[in-house]
From Swiss-Prot:
It is found in: Chromosome; Cytoplasm. Monomer. This is Chromatin protein Cren7. One of its GO terms (molecular function) is double-stranded DNA binding. HAMAP family: Chromatin_Cren7 (MF_01387). A chromatin protein, binds double-stranded DNA without sequence specificity. Constrains negative DNA supercoils. Keywords: Chromosome, Cytoplasm, DNA-binding, Methylation. Belongs to the Cren7 family. It comes from Pyrobaculum islandicum (strain DSM 4184 / JCM 9189 / GEO3). Methylated at multiple sites, to varying extents. One of its GO terms (cellular component) is chromosome. It comes from the Archaea.
Amino acid sequence: MEEVLDREYEVEYGGRKYRLKPVKAWVLQPPGKPGVVIALFKLPDGKTIRKVIMKLPPS
């Protein structure tokens, strides 16, 4: 997870694009479904949004 937090991602919100580093990231994997990595991003205007940044292969 450390490499996910150190990388910048392109986040689109309200028609604008930002290059931001995530504040927090976690894996969401319901039973029997492929998982995803979700990250929280803090926008320059103070809003916090979450976005799927990676899909995990089915296990």
